[in-house]
Curated annotation (Swiss-Prot):
Integrin ITGAL/ITGB2 is a receptor for ICAM1, ICAM2, ICAM3 and ICAM4. Integrin ITGAL/ITGB2 is a receptor for F11R. Integrin ITGAL/ITGB2 is a receptor for the secreted form of ubiquitin-like protein ISG15; the interaction is mediated by ITGAL. Involved in a variety of immune phenomena including leukocyte-endothelial cell interaction, cytotoxic T-cell mediated killing, and antibody dependent killing by granulocytes and monocytes. Contributes to natural killer cell cytotoxicity. Involved in leukocyte adhesion and transmigration of leukocytes including T-cells and neutrophils. The gene is Itgal. SUPFAM superfamilies: Integrin alpha N-terminal domain, Integrin domains, vWA-like. Heterodimer of an alpha and a beta subunit. The ITGAL alpha subunit associates with the ITGB2 beta subunit. Interacts with THBD. Interacts with CD226. This is Integrin alpha-L. Ca(2+) 2 binds at residues 528, 530, 532, 536. GO terms for cellular component: cell-cell junction; external side of plasma membrane; immunological synapse; integrin complex. Disulfide bonds join 70-77, 108-126, 147-199, 651-705, 768-774, 841-857, 994-1010, 1018-1049. Residues 1110-1162 are cytoplasmic. It is found in: Cell membrane. It comes from Mus musculus (Mouse). Belongs to the integrin alpha chain family. Residues 1124-1162 are annotated as: Disordered. The lineage of its organism: Eukaryota, Metazoa, Chordata, Craniata, Vertebrata. The integrin I-domain (insert) is a VWFA domain. Integrins with I-domains do not undergo protease cleavage. The I-domain is necessary and sufficient for interaction with ICAM1 and F11R. Residues 1-23 form the signal peptide.
C-alpha cells in the first residue's frame, strides 16, 4: 500500500486565537523543526523517507516551486536536484506520494502552463524519484495536450447600402482591420464581401495570404456601393463564391461568417445553403431600436440566436466588440458539433493529486472534459496514460473536479480500488470508487458516495486506512473541510468496507468555536503510535487559531470518535501559522524505534516525537483482611478493647505497551489514596485524620511497594458494605525536550489513556457462627389498644412498637407501617435501650393504596444484633378534612435480608386506636345575673333571683358529626334549718322543654355548700348561641333571730357522649355557675344606748375645762414677756414675723394695728 499526503489545494489563511490541548503520546515539545529559503509555502506537503523528510514548497508570485530534503542532523533543508529536467516548475511540491513497497517518491506540478493560439493550456509535470532522491528516475507530462491550432476561415459580409454615410462606412472598415490585426498570428484566414443591391468581393482568402495579411492594403481602396440591402442574396453569394477552394478556403477549416448591417433585408429568400457556416450578425443604428426590428436579424444568425446576434446603437461601439467576437469564435474553434465539450485535456491540471501502490501510479486531472475531471492511469515508466472519467459525460458532471484527490484502497483478495474525489459535483461533492483493471482491461466504477451539504467540499481530502495492517484497507476517510455545523468548521466522514461496498459508520469533528477551522484539510494514516497494534489517524485543522492537529486512535472496527490528543500550533511554536496543513508519520526519525510525526506549517516543518506508552500495574493488600467489628462499633462499657486499625500495602510496576521501544524507562508516579471516596462521610481515616492521602514515587518495570495505615471513627453505622479503597495515579511530566531525554538517559513514558484508578474493598467481620451464615428471627409487637386519637388541628398520635431478634445478626432491618391517609408522619424516636441507636423513617409516595399510606423505617441500620430488643415510638400528625372511622388501625411488618420465610409469622402486629371528635362549647354567666339579696325583719319577705347563662357552640371541621347535646342546670335544695325557702324554674332561648329531677344528697352538705339538689335537663338545639335563664323565688319563712349570710348557687354544664367526642378546650369550658350572697339582718332597740352616750360626753368635756382653769391656762402673760425680752424663746422667730420682710425694717401685724403716737410722726 502506498502512502500519500494530499494537503489543501487552496492557499490557506491563518487565525490567531487560543485553543486547549490534550496530552497523550505525541510530545508537544518539538524534537526538531526545519526551515528553508523557499517562501511561506514551504511545508505545503511533507513526506517522510528513510533518512529525513521531503518537503514540498510550491512557488508564489514569480518564484518557482521546489522540493527540499531535510535531514535530522541539520535544521536547514537542501533543494532536491532535478537533473535532466528542462521545465520550469511553478507549483512543484503541491503533490507528493510515496510507494511503501518500493520506497519511490512521486512529485507533481499540476500547473505547467503554455500558450496555444492565445489560449493558456494547463497540464502536469511529474517526477519519479528513487529512495535516495539522487535525481529523478523518470519524468513525464501526463495528459499533455499538444497545441492543435484550429483553422478558421472567416468572411466579413458588410453592408454598403445608401443608408450609410461615409463616416459610418469607415468605422466598419476600421473594425474589420482591427480584428484582422489581432488575429494575424493565428490560423485564421479572412475574406471580405460588400453587399448592397449586388455583391462585390473585396478580397478572397487567397488575396489575404498574398498580401501578407495586411488589412490596410486589402481594405485600403474599398468604396461604398450606396444601393439596397439584399442580405439573402449576399449570404448565398458568399456560399457560392467565397467559401470555395479556388478562393483559398480550406476544407478542414471552420467556416465563420460575420454579417455587419444597419438595416433589415430588402429582399427575400432562404439561406439553407449556409447551414454549415457559423453566422454571427451585428446590427447597428437606430433602425433596430424595437424588439420586432431586432428579430428580423434572427433568421440570418446561427442557433442559439441570442448568442450570435449583437445589436449596437452607434457605430462607435464597434471598436469594443472584438472581445465578444473572439469569445464567440473561440467557443466554436476546432469543432462543428455543439454536443461535445469545449475543452478536452487542454486544462487538465494533471498531477493535482497522486497516489502510488506497488509501482502503480495514478494522478488526478480535474480540468479534463470541461472540468468534469478524472484521473490518469500511468505505466511504471510514466510514459503511457489512460484517462478514466465519469461516464456518460453529461452536463451535471461538468465542473465536478473529479480527481481532485485520489487514494488507493488495497485489497488482499481482489483487485484494488481507487477512490477519487469530486468536491464540486453538484455543489455538494461526491467520491467515486473504481476497480483497477486486469491487464488490458477497463476501469469499472463500483460505487458513488455523495455529500449532503452545499459548499462543504466533500471529497476534498481522501485517506485509506489499513486498520489492522494486514494489507486490506478497511476504512475510507472522506474530508469535507468547508462543512459547517454546530459551530465547527470541517468534518471527516468514516466509511467502512462491508463486502464490496463502503458504508458510513461515524463522523470525526474538531472543537466547537471554529466555524472556519478547515478541520479535515489534511488527513493521514499514521502507524501504530500508541502500542495497540491498530493504525492511528491524524487530521489537520490549519485555521483553528494558528492551526491544530487531532490524533484519533484506532479501535477494533473503526476509529475512536473522540480525539486522544489535540496539538495546537501555538503550543508548539509561538507565532506559527497554518499548523496542520500537511501531516505524515510512518517512520522513526530519532533512533528510538518510535514513529515520529511531521507537520507542515507556513514556512516551517515541525517534527513531533512519539513517546513510549506504558501501563502501570498496581496491587492493593490489607492486613488483616477483614475489619474486626470491635474496631468500629459503638461501645457503652467502661472498658474498651484496644483498636489497631488496618495496614495497607500498595505495589506498582511499569508495563510497556510499545514493544518496539527497547530503551530504559523511568517514571515519576503521582498517586492519591481515598477511603470511601464515594461517600459524604468516610468510614476510614489516615493518621492525619483525612480520608485522602497523596504522594509521589519513582517506578520502573520492577515491582516497588509502599506501606500505609488507616483507622476508623467510633460508632460506624454501616457495618455491612465493605470499605472502598481507591488508588488514583498519573505520571508526572519532567522539564526538557524529547531530544534531551534521548541522549543517554532513561526515557520518560506516557501513561495509557484509560481509567487510572484501582479499587479494592475490605469487608467487615461477620458474627454469624461457624457456618458464616447469619439467620435472623425477628418479632414485632405493639399494644392492642392505645389511648384515643383526639381530632384537632394540633393533634398528634404516638404509637409504640417493640422489635426483638431472637436469632443471629439481622441485616438491614426495615419496619413497614400501614396507616390511614388522615395521618401524616411526624417523627420517630428510639425509647429503649438508648436514643443513640439509629432509626429513620420515610413516608413512601408510591405503592400506597387509596385508603392507606406506608411508612418505611430503617432500624439499627445496618445490623440488628442477635438477642437485641428495641422500643421505638412513631408519631403522626392529623390532617384536616379527612374522613375517619370509629377506630384507627395501624399495621406493622418487620423485614430483613437474612430471615427465613418460615420464621416470619411473628413479624407483623396491629393496633387499634379509638377516634374522638372535637366539640367546641363555651358557657358563661351574663352580667345581669342576680348576685346579692338581703332580708330584714321589716323588709319584704319574698325576692326574685335571676341567673342568665350563654352557651356558644363554635363551628369546626367536624360539625357534620355533632353529637346530641344536653344542658344540665343545677339549683340548690333548701336546708331544713335555714330561715329561707326557694323555688326554681328554667327557660331557654330557643325554647325547649326542660325536665327536673332530684339529686341524691351527699352525706356531708357542709363541705359542699353549692352542690345542686335539683337538676334540670334541657335538650339543646344546635345553634351558634343559646340563652338559658334560671329564675328562683326566695322567701323568708322564719323569724330572723340573728344576722347571718347564706350562699345560693346555680350551675350549668353541657353533656354529650364522651366515648366518641371530647371537649376541644376541656370540660371546664362548658361549665359555669352563679353564686348569690343572701344576707339575713337581725335589727335590735338602741335608744337608751344613744342617751347615755351623750350624757357621758358632756360630763367629760366639763372636767377637761375645769382642769385647764385650775392650772392657770387662761391667765398667762407670755406675749408681754417676749416683747420685753426683744427675742424669741428657744431661738424661734416670733409668730407675727414675716419671713419675706426686708432686713432692718420692723414687721407690722396688719391684722392688729396700734394707735399712732406723737413720737412716730417725726
Amino acid at each position: 500500500m502506498s502512502f500519500r499526503i494530499a494537503g489543501p489545494r487552496l492557499l490557506l489563511l491563518g487565525l490567531q486565537l487560543f485553543a486547549k490541548a490534550w496530552s497523550y503520546n505525541l510530545d508537544t515539545r518539538p524534537t526538531q523543526s526545519f526551515l528553508a529559503q523557499a517562501g511561506r509555502h514551504f511545508g505545503y506537503q511533507v513526506l517522510q523517507i528513510e533518512d529525513g523528510v521531503v518537503v514540498g514548497a510550491p512557488g508564489e508570485g514569480d518564484n518557482t516551486g521546489g522540493l527540499y530534503h531535510c535531514r535530522t542532523s541539520s535544521e536547514f533543508c537542501q533543494p532536491v536536484s532535478l537533473h535532466g529536467s528542462n521545465h520550469t516548475s511553478k507549483y512543484l511540491g503541491m503533490t507528493l506520494a510515496t510507494d511503501a513497497a518500493k520506497g519511490s517518491l512521486l512529485a507533481c506540478d499540476p500547473g505547467l502552463s503554455r500558450t496555444c493560439d492565445q489560449n493558456t493550456y494547463l497540464s502536469g509535470l511529474c517526477y519519479l524519484f528513487p529512495q535516495s532522491l539522487e535525481g529523478p528516475m523518470l519524468q513525464n507530462r501526463p495528459a499533455y495536450q499538444e497545441c492543435m491550432k484550429g483553422k478558421v476561415d472567416l468572411v466579413f459580409l458588410f453592408d454598403g447600402s445608401q443608408s450609410l454615410d461615409r463616416k459610418d462606412f469607415e468605422k466598419i472598415l476600421e473594425f474589420m482591420k482591427d480584428v484582422m490585426r489581432k488575429l494575424s498570428n493565428t490560423s485564421y484566414q479572412f475574406a471580405a464581401v460588400q453587399f448592397s443591391t449586388d455583391c462585390r468581393t473585396e478580397f478572397t482568402f487567397l488575396d489575404y495570404v498574398k498580401q501578407n495579411k495586411n488589412p490596410d492594403v486589402l481594405l485600403g481602396s474599398v468604396q461604398p456601393m450606396f444601393l439596397l440591402t439584399n442580405t439573402f442574396r449576399a449570404i448565398n453569394y458568399v456560399v457560392a463564391h467565397v467559401f470555395k477552394e479556388e478562393s483559398g478556403a480550406r476544407p478542414d477549416a471552420t467556416k465563420v461568417l460575420v454579417i455587419i448591417t444597419d438595416g433589415e433585408a430588402s429582399d427575400k429568400g432562404n439561406i439553407s445553403a449556409a447551414h454549415d457556416i457559423t453566422r454571427y450578425i451585428i446590427g447597428i443604428g437606430k433602425h433596430f431600436v424595437s424588439v420586432q426590428k431586432q428579430k428580423t436579424l434572427h433568421i440570418f444568425a446561427s442557433e442559439p440566436v441570442e448568442e450570435f446576434v449583437k445589436i449596437l446603437d452607434t457605430f462607435e461601439k464597434l471598436k469594443d466588440l472584438f472581445t465578444d467576437l473572439q469569445r464567440r469564435i473561440y467557443a466554436i474553434e476546432g469543432t462543428n458539433r455543439q454536443d461535445l465539450t469545449s475543452f478536452n485535456m487542454e486544462l487538465s491540471s494533471s498531477g493535482i493529486s497522486a497516489d502510488l501502490s506497488k509501482g502503480h501510479a495514478v494522478v488526478g486531472a480535474v480540468g479534463a472534459k470541461d472540468w468534469a475531471g478524472g484521473f490518469l492511469d500511468l505505466r511504471e515508466d510514466l510514459q503511457g496514460a489512460t484517462f478514466v472519467g465519469q461516464e456518460p459525460l453529461t452536463s451535471d458532471v461538468r465542473g465536478g473536479y473529479l480527481g481532485y484527490t485520489v487514494a488507493w484502497m488495497t485489497s488482499r483478495s481482489s483487485r484494488p480500488l481507487l477512490a477519487a474525489g469530486a468536491p464540486r459535483y453538484q455543489h455538494v461533492g461526491q467520491v467515486l470508487l473504481f476497480q483497477a483493471p486486469e491487464a488490458g482491461g477497463r476501469w469499472n466504477q463500483t460505487q458513488k458516495i455523495e455529500g449532503t451539504q452545499i459548499g462543504s467540499y466533500f471529497g476534498g481530502e481522501l485517506c485509506s486506512v489499513d486498520l489492522d495492517q494486514d494489507g486490506e484497507a478497511e476504512l475510507l476517510l472522506i474530508g469535507a473541510p468547508l462543512f459547517f455545523g454546530e459551530q465547527r468548521g470541517g468534518r471527516v466522514f468514516t466509511y467502512q468496507r462491508r463486502q464490496s461496498l463502503f458504508e458510513m459508520v461515524s463522523e470525526l469533528q474538531g472543537d466547537p468555536g471554529y466555524p472556519l477551522g478547515r478541520f479535515g484539510a489534511a488527513i493521514t494514516a499514521l502507524t501504530d503510535i500508541n502500542g495497540d497494534r491498530l493504525t492511528d489517524v491524524a487530521v489537520g485543522a490549519p485555521l483553528e487559531e494558528q492551526g491544530a492537529v487531532y490524533i484519533f486512535n484506532g479501535k477494533p472496527g473503526g476509529l475512536s470518535p473522540q480525539p486522544s490528543q489535540r496539538i495546537q500550533g501555538a503550543q508548539v511554536f509561538p507565532g506559527i501559522r497554518w499548523f496542520g496543513r500537511s501531516i505524515h508519520g510512518v517512520k522513526d526519525l530519532g533512533g528510538d524505534r518510535l514513529a515520529d510525526v511531521v507537520v507542515g506549517a507556513e514556512g516551517r516543518v515541525v517534527v513531533l516525537s512519539s513517546r513510549p506508552v506504558v501501563d502501570v500495574v498496581t496491587e492493593l493488600s490489607f492486613s488483616p483482611e477483614e475489619i474486626p467489628v470491635h474496631e468500629v462499633e459503638c461501645s457503652y462499657s467502661a472498658r474498651e478493647e484496644q483498636k489497631h486499625g488496618v495496614k495497607l500495602k500498595a505495589c506498582f510496576r511499569i508495563k510497556p505497551l510499545t514493544p518496539q521501544f527497547q530503551g530504559r524507562l523511568l517514571a515519576n508516579l503521582s498517586y492519591t489514596l481515598q477511603l470511601d471516596g464515594h461517600r459524604m462521610r468516610s468510614r476510614g481515616l489516615f493518621p492525619d485524620g483525612s480520608h485522602e492521602l497523596s504522594g509521589n514515587t519513582s517506578i520502573t518495570p520492577d515491582k516497588s511497594c509502599l506501606d500505609f495505615h488507616f483507622h476508623f471513627p467510633i460508632c460506624i453505622q454501616d457495618l455491612i458494605s465493605p470499605i472502598n479503597v481507591s488508588l488514583n495515579f498519573s505520571l508526572l511530566e519532567e522539564e526538557g525536550t524529547p531530544r534531551d531525554q534521548k541522549v543517554g538517559r532513561a526515557m520518560q513514558p506516557i501513561l495509557r489513556p484509560s481509567i487510572h484508578t484501582v479499587t479494592k474493598e475490605i469487608p467487615f467481620e461477620k458474627n454469624c457462627g461457624e457456618d458464616k451464615k447469619c439467620e435472623a428471627n425477628l418479632t414485632l409487637s405493639s399494644p392492642a389498644r392505645s389511648g384515643p386519637l383526639r381530632l384537632m388541628s394540633s393533634a398528634s398520635l404516638a404509637v409504640e412498637w417493640t422489635l426483638s431478634n431472637s436469632g443471629e445478626d439481622a441485616y438491614w432491618v426495615r419496619l413497614d407501617l400501614d396507616f390511614p391517609r388522615g395521618l401524616s408522619f411526624r417523627k420517630v424516636e428510639m425509647l429503649q435501650p438508648h436514643s443513640r441507636m439509629p432509626v429513620s423513617c420515610e413516608e413512601l409516595t408510591e405503592g400506597s393504596s387509596l385508603l392507606t399510606k406506608t411508612l418505611k423505617c430503617n432500624v439499627s441500620s445496618p445490623i440488628f444484633k442477635a438477642g437485641q430488643e428495641v422500643s421505638l415510638q412513631v408519631m403522626f400528625n392529623t390532617l384536616l378534612n379527612s374522613s375517619w372511622e370509629d377506630f384507627v388501625e395501624l399495621n406493622g411488618t418487620v423485614h430483613c435480608e437474612n430471615e427465613n420465610s418460615s420464621l416470619q409469622e411473628d413479624n407483623s402486629a396491629a393496633t387499634h386506636i379509638p377516634v374522638l371528635y372535637p366539640v367546641n362549647i363555651l358557657t358563661k354567666e351574663q352580667e345581669n345575673s342576680t348576685l346579692y339579696i338581703s332580708f330584714t325583719p321589716k323588709g319584704p319577705k319574698t325576692q326574685q333571683v335571676q341567673h342568665v347563662y350563654q352557651v356558644r357552640i363554635q363551628p369546626s371541621a367536624y360539625d357534620h358529626n355533632m353529637p346530641t347535646l344536653e344542658a344540665l342546670v343545677g339549683v340548690p335544695w333548701p336546708h331544713s334549718e335555714d330561715p329561707i325557702t326557694y323555688t326554681w324554674s328554667v327557660q331557654t332561648d330557643p325554647l325547649v322543654t326542660c325536665h327536673s329531677e332530684d339529686l341524691k344528697r351527699p352525706s356531708s352538705e357542709a363541705e359542699q355548700p353549692c352542690l345542686p339538689g335539683v337538676q334540670f335537663r334541657c335538650p339543646i338545639v344546635f345553634r351558634r348561641e343559646i340563652l338559658i335563664q334560671v329564675t328562683g323565688t326566695v322567701e323568708l319563712s322564719k323569724e330572723i333571730k340573728a344576722s347571718s349570710t347564706l350562699s345560693l348557687c346555680s350551675s350549668l354544664s353541657v353533656s354529650f357522649n364522651s366515648s366518641k367526642h371530647f371537649h376541644l378546650y376541656g370540660s371546664k369550658a362548658s361549665e359555669a355557675q352563679v353564686l348569690v350572697k343572701v344576707d339575713l339582718i337581725h335589727e335590735k332597740e338602741m335608744l337608751h344606748v344613744y342617751v347615755l352616750s351623750g350624757i357621758g360626753g358632756l360630763v367629760l368635756l366639763f372636767l377637761i375645762f375645769l382642769a385647764l382653769y385650775k392650772v392657770g391656762f387662761f391667765k398667762r402673760n407670755l406675749k408681754e414677756k417676749m416683747e420685753a425680752d426683744g427675742g424669741v424663746p428657744n431661738g424661734s422667730p416670733p409668730e407675727d414675723t414675716d419671713p419675706l420682710a426686708v432686713p432692718g425694717e420692723e414687721t407690722k401685724d396688719m391684722g392688729c394695728l396700734e394707735p399712732l403716737r406723737e413720737s412716730d410722726k417725726d
